[in-house]
Amino acid sequence: MLMKRRDHVKFLESLVNMKLNSIKRAELLQLAKQNGIALSPAEADQIAMELYGNNYNLFNDSHRNMILNKIAGIVGIERAKQIEFVFLKLTGR
């Protein structure tokens, strides 16, 4: 039986959020490199610690803004804006 489009979208959103809430330093560094964002291992560790085990929803505007504010505190506003662009690509916005 084929998944309904809405169910399919919810499933994909779940996968993205699950990855966000369990991302590791190496994965963050790889994503940063793929998207041309300078990120040190120490910064990646800090971001991963902020995200790990939380129930953030990247598709929720207030959650996304909360995450970006935490990231801006680690890497600065300019790089947080670059990361926001990646988030928007991931969420299709």
Where are these regions (language model features)?
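Amphipathic alpha-helical segments that form the core helices of the histone-fold
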Residues: 47-56, 68-69
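Protein-protein interaction and targeting regions used for scaffolding, dimerization, and localization
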Residues: 13, 41, 54, 58-62
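Short acidic/histidine-centered micro-motifs embedded in hydrophobic/aromatic stretches
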Residues: 31, 47-50, 86-89
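N-terminal acidic leader/helix
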Residues: 12-41, 45
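Short alpha-helix boundary/capping elements
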Residues: 36, 52-59, 75, 79
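Long, compositionally biased
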Residues: 61-92
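Intrinsically disordered, low-complexity linker/tail regions enriched in Pro/Ser/Thr
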Residues: 1-17
